[in-house]
Amino acid sequence: MRTYTATTTSTAGPAAVLAVLTDPDAVARWAPVDFYVDDLTHPRLSEGSRARVSGRLAGQRVGFDVQVHQADEGGLALSADGPVALDVAYELRADAVGGSEVSASVAVLPRRGLRARLLAEATAAVLASGALQHALGRIVAEASAA
């Protein structure tokens, strides 16, 4: 298992950042890997909600079943189960001037089989190249513009 982390600050408060994180239409704009929400049990990502997302990774079409464990002003935590398992957490902390600090972590857990290992390595390479930090930048920019 490999875990990738990134942290940034935002002029927007935790509620505004959470609104971007839980908006299914915004996912395609900020996700570190291009994915689209195919099916969602609730209008927004919320605690207990489930979603089906799909996209392309390393030239392969992949799909993930997502379960949201937390979605509140403290952050968003979810797990995604597919050819690679992902444990994702965004922590939100208010700062003294009305903004927030946003920390993200993504744990990549490879599954069995050659394809799964290759996709895990591709996911790790994308995250190691700074994609998570760039995603945080897009999240806070959208939250600040709202």
Regions found by a protein language model. Give the residues of each.
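Short acidic, gly/pro-rich beta-turn/loop elements at beta-sheet edges
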Residues: A16, R29, R61-G63, V88-Y90, ...
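Beta-strand/loop substructures that line and gate deep hydrophobic ligand-binding cavities in soluble
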Residues: S79-H134
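Hydrophobic/aromatic beta-strand elements that line small-molecule binding cavities or substrate pockets
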Residues: A6-T8, F64-Q70, D87-A94, V106
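Glycine-rich portal/gate segments that line the openings of hydrophobic small-molecule binding cavities
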Residues: D38-D87, E101, H134-A146
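Hydrophobic ligand-binding cavity/cleft-lining segments
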Residues: M1-H42, S46
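A generic beta-sheet turn/junction motif
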Residues: S10, L57-G59, A96
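A short, compositionally biased micro-patch
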Residues: T11, W30, A71, D81-P83, ...
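Amphipathic alpha-helical segments that line or abut small-molecule/effector binding pockets
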Residues: A15-L18, Q133, G137
